[in-house]
Design a protein with these regions (language model features):
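Proprotein-processing/basic-patch segments
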Residues: 328, 421-468
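Residue-level detector of buried hydrophobic side-chain packing
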Residues: 208, 219, 301, 342-344, ...
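Extended charged/polar low-complexity repeat regions
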Residues: 500, 514, 520-522, 529, ...
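Residues that cap or anchor secondary-structure elements
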Residues: 31-308, 427, 453-454
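Beta-strand-rich interaction/scaffold domains
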Residues: 364-429
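Short proline/glycine- and polar residue-rich coil/turn motifs
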Residues: 273-277, 333, 403-410
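A short beta-strand-loop element at or near the start of a globular domain
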Residues: 200-210, 314-367, 497
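Intrinsically disordered, low-complexity segments enriched in small residues
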Residues: 1, 5-14, 18, 28-96, ...
Length: 821
């Protein structure tokens, strides 16, 4: 059932080519000096050719008006952004896909009771009559306004519905939205004139097609408008206002275009009469343009009635000394395009881009090549430097390129991962990029496809991964911190991870180790902002969409990292896909997880999925006991018991504040306030203390090893951490007993997947990563690629990635240690 609600009230009728890119209304002159036109060079192509993982499913709950989010089979996610709406809010207030397939129904607006055709599922009710006629031929309505129109003195041409099936494969089957538009044609409504309509997600696009020179150049259109008053704005614009004098619709006639792409703005739109709901308009196309001996037919004039939607990606075409901000858009030996994102898709702090691709479709690809011997058109992408005083300037280096050829001419794609990362690094400041084929187009002109298709494909696909857990395939720089703690900074992400050891049992019969892990990316865990205790590991169910794809369970490990488990095709088990060998099976009253040499038992998901026991291959077992839903004790394989104590919060919940060890010694846990769960200190039985200090974003800026007594608190050592605006650690400094500064290291993160570490002596080491953050190489201060370091550290990547002490292990800084890192 269609919901006749327009969520954005301002609606426009554009007599313009509606391409896949909706643009701002202003235009500006562009004078392109020779020095700013730097022709293509393949000496430094920066694009990335990594193939995307396969799409598992769409995460429907993450939909927006013009985006979809997909889960990939490697655990990453793909955000697909479209240049037109693909979803609307249905009666259940859910984002539903448009289905503009036309179906027949009895006419409500036809005097002769012929059949009307209406779209299936949309927030706009759109009807098209069976025959061309002077009134109520096209009707669009919502809950408040309606507008209909027809052409005077037309032939009664029958509607012809064009079903345009599209062959799709691999990820395109998920990202392409079918039935997004319907196409119909009324042939020969006038002599040598066709009317073509596209029912789209924003309304109706109309083409007046002049098939040869023996045609009229004047058209009379009769509108019926409900609760609206028309006013002539200028020679080519008519605006429709409601009773509050607010513009609701706009009729605009900016240009027309012939088959070769020669455009003209010599169109005139004028009000002839207005009486109540009846509005009569005359559209005049320039006679000389229409009947020129140089004209290539057909000529297309493009009226449109839509609800206003602005894409985040817009284009300007540069040609000669001017820039055009409306279609059609051409790539040739003297036309190129400036593309820019108005707004970057939002990513959370722990999410990192793996890939960013920009997709463009060609309308006239098959006509560009007569046969296979024709040379391809190489289309290049360059970084835009800026537009100043009407002059477009861009880098000569090629970011990426694609080609159009005789056998492959329907689209081109740019991998602009590095450039997109740079935009995110610059605080969402987007300069854009230039698309050109100046060197190879020769006399050919490529025309970007308009958004008048039955299916929609994304213009942008961004693949990213959530790195909020402690990733085993990433490398870290590590320093001993506090008491029995380590602080490590991810070389790729720049987040700070603190691992605080609270207890480590001994013996061979399944001893227990208790860790508290802080991650600066995660600020909302229940036991302290960014903190997670190893005994909090649990099993959770996924949402409905993931479950339908076979991902029924999430295993959250001792460091708070989530592992999605997929159902096996051959047996009733769920398997991890990250190579860690995790296997889950469901029993009547519990869940069993095989994790290496350990078998873990968890409570049912209905009871919280809490861990109940762990058993090693020799049958030794650790048991976990709960009181009123909170873990109260842990018993190791030798029968030693660790007890946990809690303190209440104002909201009635509890948080851990004490760990009682098997010898009855106690570790106290302190928080900064009763409401904000930032752990301020772990105080051990010998009064050695790990103390932590935070900024306003709950990120640790300082840790101290203290010796706390009743009389005073003595600081033994400390480390300070400085962050940039993106939450990445950019400097680590160590201090001794007397607050004397020891070694420090500065860290610089670049959008080209490199990180540079520089110590106080100015020695630099450069780490290079792939797009997934896996370490590929290390270039030392002497300019050599390292496979081993003098510290004995092996430079590896993947599951064998390393940690490394970067600062001298010294509490008395009479010297600066070895200055190695």
């Amino acid at each position: 059932m269609k919901k006749a609600i327009i969520t954005k009230r301002i609606v426009s009728i554009f007599l313009s080519s509606i391409t896949a890119f909706m643009l701002p209304s202003q235009a500006f002159a562009t004078n392109l000096s020779d020095k700013n036109i730097k022709y293509s060079s393949f000496d430094d192509i920066q694009g990335n050719g990594e193939k995307a993982a396969n799409i598992v499913m769409e995460l429907e709950e993450e939909r927006t008006e013009n985006t979809k989010l997909f889960l990939l089979d490697d655990g990453s996610k793909m955000l697909a952004e479209y240049t037109e709406p693909i979803h609307y809010k249905n009666d259940n207030n859910e984002w539903a896909e448009y289905n503009n397939t036309l179906v027949a129904e009895n006419a409500l607006y036809s005097a002769d009771y012929d059949t009307d055709y209406t779209n299936k599922s949309s927030n706009l009710n759109i009807k098209l009559s069976k025959k061309a006629k002077p009134q109520n031929m096209i009707n669009i309505s919502d809950d408040e306004y309606s507008i209909s129109w027809g052409y005077e003195n037309t032939n009664k041409s029958n509607i012809i519905i064009d079903n345009n099936d599209v062959d799709l494969n691999e990820n395109d089957k998920f990202t392409s939205v079918e039935n997004i538009a319907s196409q119909v044609t009324y042939e020969n409504v006038y002599k040598n004139v066709d009317l073509q309509y596209f029912v789209t997600t924003t309304g109706v696009k109309e083409n007046i097609i002049l098939k040869n020179s023996d045609v009229q150049n004047e058209f009379y259109i009769s509108y019926k408008t409900k609760k609206l008053t028309a006013k002539q704005t200028d020679d080519y614009t008519i605006t429709l206002y409601n009773k509050d004098n607010t513009p609701v619709y706009m009729i605009n006639a900016p240009y027309m275009v012939d088959e070769k792409g020669e455009a003209s703005s010599q169109l005139k739109l004028e009000i002839l009469s207005q009486n109540g709901v009846n509005l009569n308009i005359k559209l005049t196309a320039d006679y000389d343009y229409v009947h020129s001996s140089n004209r290539s037919y057909p000529i297309t004039i493009d009226p449109e009635l839509t609800n206003k939607f602005s894409s985040e990606l817009y284009l300007n075409e540069v040609y000669g000394n001017s820039t055009l901000n409306h279609g059609p858009y051409y790539i040739s030996n003297d036309h190129y395009i400036v593309a820019k994102l108005l707004k970057l898709p939002e990513l959370d702090e722990g999410e990192k881009i793996i890939s960013a691709k920009y997709n463009f479709e060609i309308k006239n690809g098959s006509s560009l090549f007569a046969n296979e011997t024709n040379s391809p058109i190489i289309i290049n992408a360059h970084k835009l430097n800026g537009i100043e005083n009407g002059v477009v300037s861009y880098e000569s280096d090629i970011l990426d390129y694609d080609s159009l050829s005789y056998n492959d001419n329907s689209k081109f794609t740019f991998d602009l991962t590095k450039l997109t990362k740079e935009w995110y690094d610059n605080g969402d400041k987007v300069d854009g990029f230039v698309i050109e084929g100046l060197d190879t187009a020769e006399s050919r002109i490529a025309n970007l496809k308009e958004s008048t298709r039955t299916s929609a494909t994304p213009s942008i696909t961004i693949i990213y991964k959530d790195y909020s857990g402690t990733e085993s395939n990433l490398s870290y720089h590590t320093v001993s911190a506090g008491y029995n703690a380590q602080a490590k900074v991810s070389d790729y992400l720049g987040n700070l991870v603190v691992s605080q050891k609270l207890y480590e049992g001994t013996g061979a019969r399944m001893p227990v180790t208790i860790l508290a892990t802080y991650n600066s990316i995660k600020n909302n865990d229940i036991n302290g902002c960014g903190w997670y205790f190893s005994f909090e590991q649990c099993i959770k169910e996924t949402n409905k969409n993931l479950s339908n794809a076979g991902y029924n369970y999430i295993y959250i490990d001792t460091e708070g990292t989530s592992h999605y488990l997929k159902k096996s095709s051959s047996e009733e088990k769920w398997l991890g896909e990250d190579g860690l060998g995790i296997t889950l099976s469901v029993k009547e009253d519990c869940i069993i997880v095989e994790n290496g040499n350990t078998t873990q038992t968890f409570d049912t998901v209905a009871n919280g999925g809490k861990i109940l026991s762990e058993t090693d291959k020799n049958g030794n077992t650790v048991t976990y006991s709960y009181t009123n839903g909170y873990l109260s004790s842990i018993t190791d394989g030798s029968g030693r018991i660790i007890q946990l104590g809690y303190t209440g919060k104002p909201d009635g919940s509890k948080r851990i504040n004490q760990v009682t060890l098997p010898d009855n010694e106690k570790i106290s846990i302190y928080y900064n306030s009763s409401e904000i769960d930032t752990i301020s200190a772990f105080v051990f039985p010998d009064k050695k203390t790990s103390a932590f200090y935070y900024d306003k974003n709950n990120k640790i800026t300082k840790e101290q090893l203290q010796n706390r007594t009743l009389e005073n608190t003595a600081v033994i050592s400390k480390h300070c951490f400085i962050y940039n605006e993106k939450g990445q650690v950019t400097k680590i400094t160590e201090y001794g007993k007397n607050n004397s500064e020891g070694n420090y290291i500065n860290i610089t993160y670049s959008n080209d997947n490199t990180t540079v570490f520089e110590d106080r002596n100015g020695l630099k080491t450069t780490y290079t990563f792939d797009n997934k953050g896996v370490l590929m190489s290390v270039l030392n201060a002497n300019g050599y690629l390292e496979s081993n370091h003098s510290s004995g550290l092996q430079n590896t990547s993947g599951a064998d990635s390393f940690t490394k002490n970067i600062l001298a292990e010294s509490y008395e800084f009479s010297t600066i240690g070895t200055n190695k890192y």
